[in-house]
Amino acid sequence: LVLGDRVEVCIPESKEPDIEPENIPLDILYEDEDILVIDKPSNMPIHPSINHYEHTLANGVLWYYSSQNIPYTFRCITRLDRDTTGVTLLAKHMLSASVLSKAMQQKQIQKEYLALCDGIISESGTINAPIYRAADSVIERCVDFEKGDSAITHFSREQTNGRISLVR
């Protein structure tokens, strides 16, 4: 190699995915060679799990790539609950997954939520309560002061109509 040469490294996917591709419409907000950004609708799980083997974001993304004959392993960086709608970040290969996962761990990627809540919520506040897996569930989480991981949520009320509040 000499100065100015360009080296391109291709790391092939190591195995076929266990997830079945499924033709599901995707709202792709952005895509480049490293990432895929999708607006995930509510009532759609991110990936297959107990009682939700089909109609997941992973099924749809695998269809999107398999229909283009592009090998792909599903690597979701910012997961959302099944009933939550919003922007989801996916890595397109092992290197971007590693970089983005590290950025998540170091809190360099910020997530922000909007929620409609019953009643009139305080104008702002902070919830500092440790979260742990709920008993008998692999998905649900609950406040657990003995075993929970640190979780801090800052919120502000954006609007209220006296019955419900829009909270950020």
Give each language-model segment a name.
Residues 1-168:
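RNA pseudouridine synthases
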